Amino acid sequence: YVEEQLKAGRKRSTLEDYMDYSIGFSTRGCFRKCKFCVNKKYDKAFKHSPIEEFLDNDRPYLYLWDDNFFAYPKWEEILDAIEATGKPFQFRQGLDLRLMTDRKAKRFNNTNYRGDFIFAFDHIEERDRIIEKIQLWKRYSSKICKLYVLCGFESQDEKDIENTFERIKILMRYGSM
């Protein structure tokens, strides 16, 4: 497919994810059951594939599409396997900041992570917990942590807009944009 697209004149830069990255799931599942999430099939996170199963040694980078990596109790074993590849890696689904601990922040900030660390801030009701976890993260990282902001799902009225801007304001205050 990629070769066909290149021959048809598509720019390599638009296909680099498929050319430069080994892509797969090391874990699947999530316990949260968020209404907006497509993944409601599982009640917990579990090991899905060993890294070696989708690792292409000819590709310089690794993408992980895990649903909720931090919810998997043995996340550190998988992180060890990722690090053993020697390849820069990135989680593309976002990570669950609410599950951040000192150990997770320290480990992740001492890895060969490629790109931005991206988390989520879906509900204004979680503001105190999100602020606490951003501050925890910043104790270990000089890299900016960015957060997705969900809007327009539960409503599309002025309250939704107000909550969205309140979350953005919090993220701006903590340099997380």
Positions of PLM-derived features:
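Short catalytic/ligand-binding loop motif for oxyanion handling, primarily in non-cytosolic enzymes
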Residues: 32-33, 43-45, 71-73, 155-157
